[in-house]
């Protein structure tokens, strides 16, 4: 018995102690004839006396329970606990719980007691459906959900500074605006400077920016670096805006967690996560011969419309701009070190008042088919054509010469004006130098001739 009491004390702690359910003072034999009449309408149900002989109404929560042979036991689910010299029935859990009747109960035991009572009146049983208050739920800082949901912590921190960008064009015949495309961006200054991809804002008449709180603004293009695919736009807002700061992409490690956030298909703050495959995927590996930039490769999904959104580390710092999805599990981001350089150069350009530039624009995003990239694509894409070279079209932007000519995502440009294409840089040069381009593209196992004329636009 001494060991039993010691175990009880160690389990429950002082000064409270669980009482034994049987023991000293009980008769050797039960004599039912000595029991009082069986109880009826017990709100907490029936139970036997501590000696297990006569039936009595069970003690409800906070009611006194027995130390002696003639004292009642607690109702099912309750424990008889001595605390400060008084023994009462207590619920093992004192956390509130929400019932199926929409009411909040102080404990699960209280809900169960009420359920028994209403069932006795022919009403449906009340079941627990949620921990905590019906209106607020339960917030437990020590639960795994709060302790280990680091991705949610990052998203909560950065989401207010991520914006949705909607792009409009004018229909010449009807003389009215229609939505043309959408993308993402993030605020980098309290007075409204926003970073995004250059291809997001190219060839559009008007930009509308929507913040996570639903407020909308017209935006103005401030600066564009087409080669780096970075653009700076600006909105005019009242008051200071939340901003995101740049991290150092050079410090990224393969295997590090990253979070991509944006607004694909106009869905605000869509979040994907992944790891860094490499922080230094050279542009030349992607077939961008004129590129001196190393891209961040990640398996975080970057969908259409996610372009221009931030890729952040677990500290909530921007380590890249989401820019390119080749296929599932292979996406690329412009590193923050390149963004930092663009911002400095843009500041200098604005200070010196450099004017706008003109360029030819086709409306595709592409990459060269190196041997390594061919192998990756054949593993990822079913029925990938048996090509050894060419420019692989990753994306065709809406309302562009490329779309109007019939180019599609997944097409491979294999020749222009009769000359074999071996890299995306050759296509870029042809766009700059030639007028109408006579292309042959491979779609599946079919070679298709397509004629497309680039459009000249201002930046």
UniProtKB/Swiss-Prot annotation:
Annotated site residues (Involved in trimer stabilization) in this chain: 148, 150, 257
Location(s), subcellular: Cell membrane; Secreted; Cytoplasm, Cytosol
Serine protease as annotated region, ranges: 183-343
Transmembrane segments: none
Record-linked InterPro entries: Growth_fac_rcpt_cys_sf, IGFBP-like, Kazal_dom, Kazal_dom_sf, PDZ, PDZ_sf, Peptidase_S1_PA, Peptidase_S1C
GO BP annotations listed: positive regulation of apoptotic process; programmed cell death; proteolysis
Domain Kazal-like: 74-136
Superkingdom assignment: Eukaryota
Alphabetized SMART domains for the sequence: IB, KAZAL, PDZ
SUPFAM superfamilies: Growth factor receptor domain (SSF57184), Kazal-type serine protease inhibitors (SSF100895), PDZ domain-like (SSF50156), Trypsin-like serine proteases (SSF50494)
Domain PDZ stretches: 344-446
Catalytic activity, EC: 3.4.21.-
Signal peptide feature range: 1-18
Assigned keywords, A-Z: Cell membrane, Cytoplasm, Disulfide bond, Growth factor binding, Hydrolase, Membrane, Protease, Secreted, Serine protease, Signal
UniProt domain IGFBP N-terminal: residue ranges: 22-92
Keyword tRNA-binding: no
Active site: 199 (charge relay system), 229 (charge relay system), 307 (charge relay system)
GO terms for MF: growth factor binding; serine-type endopeptidase activity
Quaternary structure (record): Forms homotrimers. In the presence of substrate, may form higher-order multimers in a PDZ-independent manner.
Function: Serine protease with a variety of targets, including extracellular matrix proteins and proteoglycans such as biglycan, syndecan-4 and glypican-4. Through cleavage of proteoglycans, may release soluble FGF-glycosaminoglycan complexes that promote the range and intensity of FGF signals in the extracellular space. Consequently, facilitates inductive processes in the developing embryo, such as posteriorization, mesoderm induction and neuronal differentiation. Regulates the availability of insulin-like growth factors (IGFs) by cleaving IGF-binding proteins.
Family indicated by similarity: Belongs to the peptidase S1C family.
Protein name as it appears in the record: Serine protease HTRA1
Phylogenetic placement of the source organism: Eukaryota, Metazoa, Chordata, Craniata, Vertebrata
Gene: htra1
């Amino acid at each position: 018995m001494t060991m039993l009491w010691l175990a009880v004390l160690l389990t429950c702690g002082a000064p409270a102690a669980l009482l034994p359910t049987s023991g000293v003072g009980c008769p050797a034999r039960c004599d039912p004839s000595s029991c009082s009449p069986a109880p009826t309408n017990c709100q907490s149900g029936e139970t036997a006396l501590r000696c297990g002989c006569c039936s009595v109404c069970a003690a409800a929560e906070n009611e006194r329970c027995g130390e002696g042979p003639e004292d009642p036991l607690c109702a099912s689910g309750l424990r008889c606990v001595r605390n400060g010299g008084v023994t009462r029935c207590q619920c093992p859990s004192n956390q509130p719980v929400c019932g199926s009747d929409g009411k909040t109960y102080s404990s699960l035991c209280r809900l169960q007691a009420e359920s028994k009572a209403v069932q006795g009146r022919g009403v449906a049983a009340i079941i627990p459906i949620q921990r905590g208050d019906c209106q607020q739920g339960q917030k437990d800082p020590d639960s795994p959900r709060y302790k280990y949901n680091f991705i949610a912590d990052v998203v909560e921190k950065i989401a207010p500074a991520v914006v949705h960008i909607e792009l409009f064009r004018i229909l010449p015949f009807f003389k009215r605006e229609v939505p043309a495309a959408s993308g993402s961006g993030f605020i980098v200054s309290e007075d409204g400077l926003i970073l995004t991809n250059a291809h997001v804002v190219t060839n559009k008449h008007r930009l509308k920016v929507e913040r996570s709180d639903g407020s909308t603004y017209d935006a103005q293009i401030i600066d564009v670096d087409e080669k780096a695919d970075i653009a700076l736009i600006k909105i005019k807002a009242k008051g200071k805006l939340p901003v995101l700061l740049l991290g150092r992409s050079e410090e990224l490690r393969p295997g590090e967690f990253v979070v991509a956030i944006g607004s694909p298909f106009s869905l605000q703050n869509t979040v994907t996560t992944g790891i860094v495959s490499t922080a230094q995927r050279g542009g030349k590996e992607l077939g961008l011969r004129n590129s001196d930039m190393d891209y961040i490769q990640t398996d975080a999904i970057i969908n259409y419309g996610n372009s221009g959104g931030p890729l952040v580390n677990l500290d909530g710092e921007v380590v890249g701009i989401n820019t390119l999805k080749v296929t599932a599990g292979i996406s690329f981001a412009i590193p923050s070190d390149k963004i930092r350089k663009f911002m400095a150069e843009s500041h200098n350009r604005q200070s010196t008042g450099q004017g706008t530039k003109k360029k030819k624009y086709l409306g595709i995003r592409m990459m060269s088919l190196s041997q390594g990239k061919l192998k990756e694509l054949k593993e990822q894409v079913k029925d990938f054509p048996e090509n050894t070279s060419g420019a692989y079209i990753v994306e065709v932007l809406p309302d562009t010469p490329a779309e109007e000519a019939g180019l599609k995502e997944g097409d491979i440009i294999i020749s222009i004006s009769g000359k074999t294409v071996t890299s995306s840089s050759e296509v870029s040069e042809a766009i700059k130098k030639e007028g109408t381009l006579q292309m042959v593209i491979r779609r599946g196992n079919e070679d298709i001739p397509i004629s497309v004329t680039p459009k000249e636009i201002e930046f």
